């Protein structure tokens, strides 16, 4: 059992999947503040909920007095991380990379404090293009390449799976692990970083950086990975029919972000409260153990607390109040027409186009499909983009589905 506050709380929250030497890292953290980093791939101009666990790990690290580094992959983005991908990433331009880095920095500022706000312990924003763009290929081979075993690299799960599926791996992508390892050593030299954190898919790359630094500099550094987050039904975290659940309000309205967390499956509530909120672990466990209608209150707390971290307390409470007005017996809902729906229809799973038919917002299946394709259809205030997306009793909010078309047509479907 670790003794340092960060590792103690990280373990209690379930944030630790693997760690290279937990006892030695614990000793280092007990001795004083350390510097740790997480890398971010600038392939989009916002982070999303799929990145949230490593962001929360950085946030927790900073809470306990350690300094985070947010490393932008401005150099490695020109190659692309092949980890567990079916095909090579499309190469992106320098202009797009710069735009995306600015957006990711804005995303991170919603969660952690940077050095321009707190010089003593604020996060450092680094960009690996600052050193990778200046590398000489011959020098890289002499300095770094000599320490890498091709047979070992072929054994990385991310590489092996691509090769086993006979999808190929370019030499460009194969070099990604070498450059990420170089990053760890460089951040150790420049900023004293002794810990790299990342998702479980980054384990091989992290260990390679530790090994390189030990071989060339004789230093002990550490790696820690967070678990892969899936829902209890096996769905990948942060993905929906609409795509990624973005953290920037310019990419996704705050209310929809709140709704994402409100729609958490019952079995995931306790786990997600520990992962994605600052509530005490004991409170997370108490809320997660609630059953029946009480679990819905826990989901609202999860939604409000997770949204408050990302968008601020005021915006989170405004989203919660909007939801209360719409879904609970308040003035907004009382004014909406209600249609009874045979419960057996939705219990078996009702396709989205049928939902709009049953609500009377479309006269036929074809019209309903066209309505959805046009982007004007919403269920529970979330845009429906897949006409065959199914809705079940689990999607009810206080006993109803709110079905909307445009800004003024709203119907409540109540299974009976």
Swiss-Prot record:
This is Tyrosine--tRNA ligase. It catalyses: tRNA(Tyr) + L-tyrosine + ATP = L-tyrosyl-tRNA(Tyr) + AMP + diphosphate + H(+). Coiled coil: none annotated. It is an enzyme of class 6 (ligase). PROSITE patterns: AA_TRNA_LIGASE_I, S4. The gene is tyrS. Catalyzes the attachment of tyrosine to tRNA(Tyr) in a two-step reaction: tyrosine is first activated by ATP to form Tyr-AMP and then transferred to the acceptor end of tRNA(Tyr). It is found in: Cytoplasm. NCBIfam families: tyrS. Keywords: Aminoacyl-tRNA synthetase, ATP-binding, Cytoplasm, Ligase, Nucleotide-binding, Protein biosynthesis, RNA-binding. GO terms for cellular component: cytosol.
């Amino acid at each position: 059992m670790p003794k340092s506050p960060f590792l103690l709380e990280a373990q209690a929250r379930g944030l630790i999947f693997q760690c290279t030497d937990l006892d030695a890292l614990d000793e280092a953290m007990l001795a004083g503040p350390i510097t740790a980093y997480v890398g971010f791939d600038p392939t989009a101009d916002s982070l999303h909920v799929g990145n949230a666990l490593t962001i929360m790990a950085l946030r927790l690290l900073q809470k306990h007095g350690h300094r985070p580094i947010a490393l932008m992959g401005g150099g490695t983005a020109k190659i692309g991380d092949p980890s567990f991908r079916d095909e090579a990433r499309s190469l992106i331009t320098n202009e797009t990379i710069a735009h995306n880095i600015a957006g990711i920095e804005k995303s991170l500022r919603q969660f952690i404090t940077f050095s321009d706000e707190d010089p003593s312990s604020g996060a450092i924003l680094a960009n690996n293009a600052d050193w990778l763009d200046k590398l000489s290929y011959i020098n890289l081979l002499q300095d770094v390449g000599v320490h890498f075993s091709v047979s070992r690299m072929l054994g990385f799960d991310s590489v092996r799976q691509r090769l086993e599926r006979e999808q190929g791996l370019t030499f460009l992508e194969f070099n990604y692990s070498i450059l990420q390892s170089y990053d760890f050593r460089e951040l150790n030299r420049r900023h004293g970083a002794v810990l790299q954190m990342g998702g479980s898919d980054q384990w091989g790359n992290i260990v390679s950086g530790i090994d390189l630094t030990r071989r060339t500099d004789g230093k002990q550094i550490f790696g820690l990975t967070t678990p892969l987050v899936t829902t209890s039904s096996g769905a990948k975290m942060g993905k929906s029919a609409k795509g990624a659940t973005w953290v920037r309000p310019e990419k996704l309205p705050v209310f929809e972000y709140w709704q994402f967390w409100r729609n958490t499956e019952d079995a995931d509530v306790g786990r997600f409260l520990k992962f994605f909120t600052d509530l005490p672990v004991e409170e997370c466990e108490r809320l997660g153990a609630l059953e029946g209608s009480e679990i819905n209150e826990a989901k609202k707390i999860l939604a409000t607390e997770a949204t408050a971290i990302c968008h601020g307390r005021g915006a989170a409470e405004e989203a919660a109040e909007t939801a209360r007005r719409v879904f609970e017996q308040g003035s907004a809902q009382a004014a909406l027409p209600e249609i009874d729906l045979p419960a057996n229809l939705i219990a078996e799973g009702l396709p989205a186009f049928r939902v709009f038919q049953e609500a009377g917002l479309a006269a036929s299946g074809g019209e309903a499909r066209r309505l959805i394709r046009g982007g004007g259809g919403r269920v529970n205030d979330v845009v429906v983009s897949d006409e065959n997306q199914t809705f079940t009793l689990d999607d009810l909010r206080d006993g109803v589905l709110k079905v909307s078309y445009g800004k003024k047509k709203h119907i409540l479907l109540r299974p009976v």
